[in-house]
Amino acid sequence: QFMNSITENLNHIHSSIDSAVDNCKRDENSVKLLCVSKTKPKEMVIEAYNDGERHFGESYAVEASEKIEQLKELGYNDIVWHFIGPIQKNKTKLIATHFDIVESVDRVIVAKRLDEQRPDNLKPLEVLIQVNISDESQKSGCAIADIDELIKEIQSLKKLKLRGFMGIGKDTDSREEIQKEFAQLKNLFDK
């Protein structure tokens, strides 16, 4: 449920995060909020920025690259931009040029294109391999059987830095099913 303002929403979300962190006995710095700003105007990003947010997620490469450039021109240079959507091969140059982190690399061809198109003056692009942990055909992500090949490829590329995995679980009310899928993702990461 949404409140009246971005500030109220953020306060509510951070309160929920703090409670979850306390319940799980985790370090409070181990969880970061990623504000999804796709389709939102730059003014809303600025409002969240003024409330202390620095991580923003976008999934429309063209719209995002324009927004990112506008915000940089206004002096918002310390925002960490995450690309969070499916990657179309014809959009890899925009993603490689404007983003800091890509959370949805699922194919070798995409990794190679991001590496080739990352400008030399930028630090390596941090990437997460999107894994299809629910094994649902309608969900994107690398099949578990193909992960080792994709990891090796990414590790061989100079302009990419493998940061971890990302997975989207089944849309289910079964807490057990959700925990099983994400435990599988954690096991892959620990491997």
Where are these regions (language model features)?
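Donor-binding and catalytic core of enzymes assembling or modifying cell-surface/extracellular glycoconjugates
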Residues: 191
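Conserved alpha/beta-domain cores
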Residues: 2-188
